[in-house]
Amino acid sequence: SLMRQESLFDSAITSSAGARGLMQLMPATASEVAANMGYPPNFTLDDLYLPVVNIKLGARYLARQINYLGGDMMAAMAGYNGGPGNAAIWQELSRGDPDLFVECIRFDESRQYVIRIYENFEIYRKIYELP
């Protein structure tokens, strides 16, 4: 759902802000995550257009968001788009209520992002007959 929202599965896309690839990683974020992982050894920003590299780095960055935000997937998605510090504030304001959390997101882009990811998730759940 996140990848669909970020790039519509286009591995060659670059956003107007400079985010690259399937999971739309910003170069500075990707470089920092790659350095922390030691992956790949001769990482360049052009590697962000390689699905295997982009997904691995994006998944690691998302895992950091999930960990930082106490396992709260909705907050992690908001943090992926709007920054982890902002997501932590919205999480605190909403006191665990997912509907209130969405309303606490102060950036319209991030609010719509979270809503669309969950809509996509429900569609995929039905398509693939997942519980």
Task: Show the residue positions of the predicted features.
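Catalytic glycan-binding domains that act on GlcNAc-containing polysaccharides
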Residues: 1-131
